[in-house]
Every structure is written in C-alpha cells, then in structure tokens.
Amino acid sequence: MAKKTPSIDTKNLTAVQLMELDSCTRCGECVKWCPTYAASGQKPGLAPRDKILRWRQFMNKSYGIKAKLFGPTEIPQSELEEFKDDVHGCTTCGICATVCESGINTVELWEALRTNLVKKGIGPFGKQNMFPKLIGQYHNPYMKDQKDRLNWVPPDVKIEDKADVVYFTGCTAGYNQLALAFATARVLNKLGVKFSMLGEEEWCCGSALIRTGQVHVDDVPRELARHNVEALKKKGAKKVLYACAGCFRASKVDWPRLLGEELPFEVVHVAEFLADLIKQDKIKWEKSINKTVTYHDPCHLGRHVGVFDAPRYVLSHIPGVKFVEMDRVKEFQRCCGAGGGVKAGIPDLALGVAESRVKDAVATDADILSSCCPFCKRNLMDGRDSLKVDMVVEDVIELVAEALGLETK
C-alpha cells in the first residue's frame, strides 16, 4: 500500500515558529484587538487564536503520534481552502503580536503560513496570484510602462544625476498618488537637499509579493531587491529616502533577508529625515496651517519598524497645527485595513477596517487625518467617503509642503 503523504508540510516554518504554534495559551487577548475580526462581524476563523489552533490541529493530524503510528490523516481540501481564506483575511498589522502574552511573532508566522500554503498550491487569495506575473513582467503592480516612472516630475523640480541622497518614489506614489511624490520632491528642493532618483531603473520593492506568501515565486522578490540595491549603488546612494511605509519596511527589513547581507546605504523614512532637520533648525516655515490634525500610524512604519515619534515631532512643529491623538495609537493603533494584500484581495473587508479607523479620527474632532503611507491614505479616504465624513486625509509630507508654501499638484 502506498505511503500516505501529509496534507501540509513544515518546510517553510522555522524551529522557533513551530514552537510558537505550541506556545499559544488560547487566552484570547489577540481576538479583542484584531481589526479584521471586528470588521468582519466577528467571523471566528479570522481570529488570530483560531488560526493558530487550526494549524496546530493540521500539524497533529499530519505529524502527531497517531500520524507516526498509522499514517497522516488527510485534511479535506475544503478545510485547507477555508483556512487559506482566513489567513489571507489578515492585514499583517501585528497588533496580535503586540498584545500576545506568549510573545508570538505573528506577522512572521502568518506570512510563513501563507507561503506554506502557496507552495502546496493553495492560495494566494483572489487576484493576488497575479502579483508575480505583473511585477515580474512590468516591474510594478499597475502594468505601467517603466519609461513613465518620472513622467510625474514637474519642470520646477531639480533632480541630480548622482547624489548621496536618493529618493525611492515607490510604485503607488510614482504612478497613482502623485501628490505624495510632488510634495516630497519639492520639499527636498526647498530645503536645499540635493537628491537623485532611479527613474525607470526603480523596480517595485516586492512588498506585495512578500506579504501575500509569494516570496518564493519565480524568485521575483529577490531579483527586485538585488536590482534596486545595485541601481541605488550606481547612483552613489549613501542615504535612501522613502515616503511610502511599505517600501520603507521592505527595504529595511526584507531586502537584507532576501540578499543575505546588510544594505550598503542608510534606509530612512522622510518623516525621520524631516524631524532631524527640524531639530537642527534647518526648516524655515512660510505658512501657518491653522488646523487640528490627528495622526494614523502605518503598521509598516510603526509596529513593524518602530518609527512612532518622528511623524508626531514633525506635525507638532508645523505652524498652526493643533495636534491631537486618537484613542488607539503607536503600538496599539488600529490598522487602516489596506495591508497584507487585503485591499487587493478582500476590498470590502479592507473598507470595514478603514471605517473603524476613520471613526477613531472623527472622535478627536480633527480637521485633518494624516499618515505617512500612500496605502493608508487611499484606504482611509475610502473609509471617509463611505461614511460621508467631512475630513481631509493628507500625508504628513503634504502638510509640510503646504507650510513651506509649496504646491502638491
């Protein structure tokens, strides 16, 4: 009789992650905080605890004592498909890791489980499976021509051919959310910062692939990282600036892992860069904003990398800004709902999470809801529009540009 093979495998899980699966005490603290669980109407399968317990059951059926004695118990395909849907119904925001009493690194775990399933031919979710082909072929997820990478650059913006500082625009800002790119470039010019850009040599950072469990597909993410690092080196980069939290996280955390070496340049978010200039008294403001502003921490910038204070420092020093905090901030903020491929794969769920976050902002009576990420901005705008709320959603760098008397159009 042919030997039965397990329905799942452990090849993509580290020894630590296997121990973490066993360390969950089922306390349920993560369930109270999970944004997608709440936005789904408390669908049990989306709860972090439930996902860990179900995978633990799968492991027991495949590799437990009974499985060793009598062979693995087959896990119905329908169960695996349902689990795939639930593990992809997560923004990988990381709040469950923050509140976990057992210290489980859930963000890494969810991504490992997604990769495990994709390798078995289960997943990713919906149109997320187009990411490797699109990004591999076009070097961006929007099927845009690479020759158009710098089409957004207005005549008044000066870009050096080579410079110590390189602005990595990102696909979203460079193709879709041009106000973010305008603001960043003009602010750098205004402050006398000489900077270069990669132009058509800038490829996608790979975040969308990594977050959705497709880090291994055709080796695309590693090739993206390798190409971008080499292109940045050719530009003479000593410091690379990012206005996109997703690109920033991918470059700072994922690229070194993919390449197996430290990056030969410093990775800095533009909020950190501006905060340092303010501390050195190198910014001369020209206009008072005179608005009440609250701030949403992007998960990729905040919980994933630990940049919480710089954006707040910048906002609090913009003339006329009355800065107010929402109820859930910093390590305990509520996700905007766009991350982890949820905006692309399950837009209704992403919108539900965004609506919850917009309600947090409305409770502060702020005029402006700001953030440091184009994905957060897009989804928060969608949440605002869905709720028909009269509130401006702007990136911090856009507010800085306005206070410097600059256009963002």
Curated annotation (Swiss-Prot):
Work out whether the entry's keyword set contains Thylakoid.
Answer: no
Q: How is the cofactor bound?
A: Binds 2 [4Fe-4S] clusters per subunit.
Citing just one GO molecular function, the answer is: metal ion binding
Pfam families xrefs: CCG, Fer4_8
Catalysed transformations (reactions): methanophenazine + coenzyme B + coenzyme M = dihydromethanophenazine + coenzyme M-coenzyme B heterodisulfide
Q: What is its main location?
A: membrane
- Outline the extent of the 4Fe-4S ferredoxin-type domain: 14-44, 81-110
GO cellular component terms listed in the entry, alphabetical order: plasma membrane
Record InterPro entries: 4Fe4S_Fe-S-bd, 4Fe4S_Fe_S_CS, Cys_rich_dom, HdrB/HdrD_reductase, Helical_ferredxn
Report the pathway entry: Cofactor metabolism; coenzyme M-coenzyme B heterodisulfide reduction; coenzyme B and coenzyme M from coenzyme M-coenzyme B heterodisulfide: step 1/1
Q: Which cofactor does it need?
A: [4Fe-4S] cluster
Q: Which UniProt keywords apply?
A: 4Fe-4S, Cell membrane, Iron, Iron-sulfur, Membrane, Metal-binding, Methanogenesis, Oxidoreductase, Repeat
Residues annotated to bind [4Fe-4S] cluster 1? 24, 27, 30, 100
Instruction: List residues binding [4Fe-4S] cluster 2.
Output: 34, 90, 93, 96
Group of enzyme by EC = oxidoreductase
Per the UniProt entry, what are the Gene Ontology biological process annotations, in alphabetical order? methanogenesis
Q: What is its EC number?
A: 1.8.98.1
Its subcellular locations are: Cell membrane
Top-level division of the source organism's lineage: Archaea
Q: What does this protein do?
A: Part of a complex that catalyzes the reversible reduction of CoM-S-S-CoB to the thiol-coenzymes H-S-CoM (coenzyme M) and H-S-CoB (coenzyme B).
Q: How does it assemble?
A: The dihydromethanophenazine:CoB--CoM heterodisulfide reductase is composed of two subunits; HdrD and HdrE.
The remark listed among the other comments is:
Methanophenazine seems to mediate electron transfer from F(420)H(2) dehydrogenase to the dihydromethanophenazine:CoB--CoM heterodisulfide reductase.
User: What family name appears in the similarity comment?
Assistant: Belongs to the HdrD family.
Q: Give the protein name, as stated in the record.
A: Dihydromethanophenazine:CoB--CoM heterodisulfide reductase subunit D
Source organism (scientific name): Methanosarcina mazei (strain ATCC BAA-159 / DSM 3647 / Goe1 / Go1 / JCM 11833 / OCM 88) (Methanosarcina frisia)
